[in-house]
Each structure stands twice: as C-alpha cells, then as structure tokens.
Amino acid sequence: MMRLSVQDGYFIHPVSGKADVSIEGVITDSGTLSRNYYGSNNKLECWSLDSQYPHPDVPDASQQSVRCIDCPQNVRQSGYKPCKFFTTINVVPDKTNMVCEIRIGGASLFAKAVNKMSLFKYIDYLKRNGESIDTVLTEIYLVHEAVPKMYFKPSRPLAEDEMQTVTRLVE
C-alpha cells in the first residue's frame, strides 16, 4: 500500500511527488488508536497497537509498564506526554484508483479547535448527520500552528458508482 506522507507542512503525493496543503479522498478505515514511545536516543522503545497494553514484540527491557494507563510515559511532562497517540487511516484520494495510508498524530486526533474538526470530531459529526466516513468525499487539510495539525471536513456525499469503486479498491 502506498503511503501519503506529510513533509514540511505539505502532503506529498506517493506517485507524482506533488506537494499540497490539502487532499480530497474517501477515508475507508479510520484506524485503531495506538501509541508509541521513543526513548532518550530517539529510538522506538515501547509501543501499543491498542492503546491498552504494550505490543507482545516489545522487548522486556524496553517495556515501560504492564498497562498503558499506568505507564510513567503517559504522564504529562513539560506540556506533553512522552508516549504519543497515533492512528493510521486508509484513504482513496479523489480521482485515483489507489488506497494510501496516512499516519495521524494525537494532536490531529484530539484537537479542540474552533470551527475545525479533528479526526474523531469529524467521525462523530458524520454519525450525527446519518453518514459514515466511507460514504463521503473528505477534505483533509493541514494547518500550520505551533503544533501542525490535520483537520477534516466533508466535501460531498459519494455517488453510488463512486462507493462501488471504493469498495472494489479496498477488497
């Protein structure tokens, strides 16, 4: 699967290399809330794919705690938590026939901005309006703040043929 990366505040298209501050696409999988902790040498030491318990592959010497909620790296230190939330979503960019991964950091999952929606706020918004995330063309855009964030907003509902195309691509 192709990875749609973010570099210097721009999405980088995985094929063309074109940089853009926003993309439109269909989110086909909203991901699983996960966590990771990078130690003092910036090496990944501990991680969780369910945000509850360290992954079984984490070496005992690197494991920070038996449960994520009890972990000392889950305590706010100087304005941030060393153990970071993230998720990886799957997106079919508009006018393409490919599925891409986008990694979304905690600031873009839980942001409390006015008139902007983090991923979780966006999913709740769609549910309240009788839609699901995979039936709407979504604009994902970057905002350059002290901590850069991704925000989400609906562009339009998908037509039936578009939904069928997306379903074929993800199967």
Question: Where in the sequence are the language-model features?
Answer:
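Extended serine/threonine-enriched, polar tracts that run as long, contiguous segments within proteins
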Residues: 82-160
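OB-fold ssDNA-binding interfaces and closely related basic DNA-contact patches used
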Residues: 1-98, 147-149, 155
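Short peripheral tails and domain-boundary helices/loops at the edges of structured domains
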Residues: 156-171
